[in-house]
Amino acid sequence: MSFSVEVLAGIAIELQRGIGHQDRFQRLITTLRQVLACDASALLRYESRQFIPLAIDGLAQDVLGRRFTLEGHPRLEAIARAGDVVRFPADSDLPDPYDGLIPGQESLKVHACVGLPLFAGQNLIGALTLDAMTPEQFEVFSDEELRLVAALAAGALSNALLIEQLESQNMLPGSSGVFEPIKETHMIGLSPAMTQLKKEIEIVAGSDLNVLIGGETGTGKELVAKAIHQGSPRAVNPLVYLNCAALPESVAESELFGHVKGAFTGAISNRSGKFEMADNGTLFLDEIGELSLALQAKLLRVLQYGDIQRVGDDRSLRVDVRVLAATNRDLREEVLAGRFRADLFHRLSVFPLFVPPLRERGDDVVLLAGYFCEQCRLRLGLSRVVLSPDARRHLLNYGWPGNVRELEHAIHRAVVLARATRAGDEVILEAQHFALSEDVLPAPPAESFLALPTCRNLRESTENFQREMIRQALAQNNHNWAASARALETDVANLHRLAKRLGLKD
């Protein structure tokens, strides 16, 4: 056997050294890559007929954002169906899911691959994949040795999943409650900002509190609402969605509370509103700041007393609904301006959440790009869609004013452009395929930084100086607001508010 007792003991010890599951997983695959002298290793979690990367070593960073469906990846399907070690020869007809995703080897095909399915009892919970550019790399290791590695990895993953399930079910000591754990909701990201958001979602999901979700347009507030609902005791009941900004004033009340036959012209039958549809479930009110003051008052009554009245009906109906609301506005400012009721604001914001803009999420941009690349690959029937190193740098240097939604559209557009200029079913996205509307701003000359403005009064001079300071900080930090705030030694939220007041942003 090529594995000594010391090597196996070392792997087991590494699994105990990490502070958290993610650290342990990373130590595991890094150690395996070193022991097996292979080019890449990955630990994948199995869920809903797809493999979700948990930790990687030797692979492009965007792999962590990809979701590998069994239907789209025959090698992974073979691993999922097998109950034992799977070896793919160098001349295998099945494409490797990591072709083009090993840094420095983007144009080469992976030659050797070993897949180790991971089980908890009889249930498939994940897989280990090992890849090498040398065809004979894994021949010196027997199946028995690889099974031992798989057993160690399966034990670590099984324990992590069990703890995650217990935490999401509030069944750890000192808590109670039984309901489904949070499932995959495509909330992709490992940045500190997203890690904190996920923790806050787990905290509030198991309660029955109303939640106000804030954040810029395109940040993914609806995904946050879905994650909260899926992690709650109401998950077995419906999550009903309503975009308040798309509601004409004439039908808004009927959409929310329903109507009876004959209540108004065109009301030819009784109709349930969104609150009735969401009874015993969750109602997600997107763009809550767009509701009129009159409707805000009626919404407040529902939150206070739990009853509604259909339009044209004198009777009240009891409903049990949890309300999640989202807005891209600063509702505190809306309250001060008299456009939003203070009492409703306080009812909704029992547990406020803020979804960070993409420009403050660092390398999450690359993970999300990988996710969208995989989506495009499946949708267009391509064998692979990968990002070149220049494309990754280009995406990281862009400010993403449209956030995740803009990134999604940019990836889809780039794939179409790249496909049109390259024959075959393989697409490599280069920087020139991204026609981004806002280029990285060059740094201004140093001597202009403290140039004094010429204005009539102190207030105007101060505001002009503040504008110039903010513009220069943004230019020097690639239009990254968080980095600019740090450079100016101020809070990023305060910087956004000041920039808005000075007319530097909408």
Curated annotation (Swiss-Prot):
Gene Ontology terms, MF aspect: ATP binding; ATP hydrolysis activity; DNA binding; DNA-binding transcription factor activity
Annotated transmembrane regions: none
Positions of modified residues (4-aspartylphosphate): D57
List of residues binding ATP: 215-222, 278-287
Pathway(s) it belongs to: Nitrogen metabolism; nitric oxide reduction
Keyword flag Nucleotidyltransferase: no
Signal sequence, start to end: none
Span of domain Sigma-54 factor interaction: 187-416
Keyword Transferase among UniProt keywords: no
Pfam short name (any one): GAF
GO biological process terms on file: phosphorelay signal transduction system
Alphabetized SMART domains for the sequence: AAA, GAF
Keyword terms, alphabetized: ATP-binding, DNA-binding, Nucleotide-binding, Phosphoprotein, Transcription, Transcription regulation
UniProt cross-references to CDD domains, sorted A to Z: AAA
DNA-binding interval(s): 481-500
Record NCBIfam families: PRK05022.1
Role this protein plays: Required for the expression of anaerobic nitric oxide (NO) reductase, acts as a transcriptional activator for at least the norVW operon. Activation also requires sigma-54.
Name assigned to this protein: Anaerobic nitric oxide reductase transcription regulator NorR
Organism: Salmonella agona (strain SL483)
GN (gene name): norR
